[in-house]
UniProtKB/Swiss-Prot annotation:
Zn(2+) 2 binds at H107. The keyword Glycoprotein applies. PROSITE patterns: SHSP. It comes from Tupinambis teguixin (Golden tegu). Heteropolymer composed of three CRYAA and one CRYAB subunits. Inter-subunit bridging via zinc ions enhances stability, which is crucial as there is no protein turn over in the lens. Can also form homodimers and homotetramers (dimers of dimers) which serve as the building blocks of homooligomers. Within homooligomers, the zinc-binding motif is created from residues of 3 different molecules. His-100 and Glu-102 from one molecule are ligands of the zinc ion, and His-107 and His-154 residues from additional molecules complete the site with tetrahedral coordination geometry. Keywords: Acetylation, Cytoplasm, Eye lens protein, Glycoprotein, Metal-binding, Nucleus, Zinc. Zn(2+) 1 binds at H100, E102. This is Alpha-crystallin A chain. Contributes to the transparency and refractive index of the lens. May act as a chaperone, preventing aggregation of various proteins under a wide range of stress conditions.
Amino acid sequence: MDITIQHPWFKRALGPLIPSRLFDQFFGEGLFEYDLLPLFSSTISPYYRQSLFRTVLESGISEVRSDRDKFTIFLDVKHFSPEDLSVKVIEDFVEIHGKHNERQDDHGYISREFHRRYRLPSNVDQAAITCSLSADGMLTFAAPKVQSNTDPSHNERPIPVSREEKPTSAPPS
């Protein structure tokens, strides 16, 4: 029986280059070719995955932008339909919730659920907030900012999610 021994300096030296699998958002999506490479699976550790081949937008990680005149959130929700998504503004926060029941995919049956909560800037016009879902599954939450320092209304208000026909391959820079 072979046991791989890893020195602490080896883990720390490569730690920033190889993200931890413990907090991986890609569970349930199957294996990739680089998951099966013995170099990364046995030499380093079974708890690490080489994720350099994925772009940020494919990973499900959100992008938040706060420009001078607009606050925008881009979130990859490609596994959810508009009926599976709920977007609400509660006081100074926007809450995005997605849930779909168990369904069959290429690897078996899967159900997914997520909750995201973002603090809105104090100068956002909450009455003019929009939210849309592109054909390729990119959710775009946009809130224009007002120049005056008026206090926004503090109540819960659902934001409808509209479907766009064109894909959003990347958020505009």
